Amino acid sequence: MAPHRLHRLIPASVALTTVCATLPASAAYAADTPPTPHLDSIERSLRETSPGLEGSVWERTDGNRLDAPADNPSGWLLQTPGCWGDAGCKDRAGTRRMLDKMTRNIADARHTVDVSSLAPFPNGGFEDAVVAGLKASVKAGHSPRVRILVGAAPLYHLNVVPSRYRDDLIDKLGPAAGKVTLNVASMTTSKTSLSWNHSKLLVVDGKTAVTGGINGWKDDYLDTDNPVSDVDMALSGPAARSAGKYLDTLWDWTCRNASDPAKVWLATSNGSSCMPSMEKDEAGATPAEPTGDVPVIAVGGLGVGIKESDPSSGYHPDLPTAPDTKCTVGLHDHTNGDRDYDTVNPEENALRSLIASARSHVEISQQDLNGTCPPLPRYDIRTYDTLAGKLAAGVKVRIVVSDPANRGAVGSGGYSQIKSLDEISDTLRTRLVALTGDNEKASRALCGNLQLASFRSSDAAKWADGKPYALHHKLVSVDDSAFYIGSKNLYPAWLQDFGYIVESPAAAKQLKTELLDPEWKYSRQAASTPAGCPAGATG
């Protein structure tokens, strides 16, 4: 029985002495820890959807620490470029801190370094940070094993060659290369379902982790006058090992398919073979050491092609349908119509559950809410329905997305997939009408509770070079209490993704102060009023 419930069954005269005398110290401590209603709700959803993936794709842990330097308590939040209020973006303090964090974490490596990203491989200043860290690790007397994994889109990434990147790393490492064992791979788990790795992780010794939306691409983030705005988070503790276990899951598939060039290209160094269980091999049966008191759910997804379903799951969802999710030519809709897909991609329901757990307000900062249609479905019906339910219940919802002016010629070719913010508000209105059965109620909920804007990071409408602001966050925050930072988008995409859900009012306050408040300060100037709402009436 949970310790905090014992007092209900024990007479008041003896309750305190009985609890103190009989409970283990750890249980007594647990009774005093803050409640975690958001994580509890999400964990229930995960156990229903994907019980068999606990410990490999998702895991809840306590005892974590948001990894910030002593002189900067919010330094666990790693933003690029970090030049709020300056359209010229002359001082990119956030980018410098992020690159320095990469180098310092890797420099501390005694045994293992795990890097994952979307292709191409980390280059420019990102590669320099990796190399500098590895050189420092070797100089300290260590011989780290290193895995670097990128997801490759068919045809688009044919020029991403692991052997070439391995050789480049060896050249830059110089004499230190002899002490570094490399596995470098690109992978595509399903060409027909457009599935490949999309996680962005740096895990060192299973003790520290950095994850979020930042890809290691110099041309998008570093060597440009219009850098992408993005965010990662850093932590230490048991949740870092959870990330390592997830990467072991991806590498297990990668190593098993390394002989199939249609799926995997692999290059190694120093005579090594493919390392499918590097994190597990290093950690063994040793429990992960706590470093703090922050509860975290680590949650990822396997996309399509790694595992068909979780056979231990008894999940039986009522899958909704909507005619406007489909386009003229489309693939099988894994997002809206595939129970088995749900069971091996627990992050999907985890994010819906996070939004559903909100009682007062939701902040969403994303590249998009709508996907590239065709070939993907236009939107996630259950996510939109969850948002509609919150709006109808009087919960305030704020959504900031990348400026639609970033839309590429083929939809996802740029940092936006929509032509207008109306695509989001119109869809929300449609789902509200379906939920309430009443146009007037739907309008009241939408006009009274929604704030919707395209992203800006200064008072100027565009960067100083005239380019639109590109936003690549994958961020959801609720009730100033819990939040998700990772690589998973809210729009349909069937990739391998990973992120952390943290419940900590103190950390959520830092997130609000350092990111959400300045974001809205500037983005509200680009706010959109949904059709049918009085000007300035929203939110």
Regions inferred by a protein language model and the residue ranges of each:
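Coil-to-alpha-helix initiation sites in intrinsically disordered, low-complexity, charged segments
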Residues: 1-7, 37, 56
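Charged, low-complexity intrinsically disordered terminal segments
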Residues: 31-539
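Secretory targeting and sorting signals
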Residues: 2-30
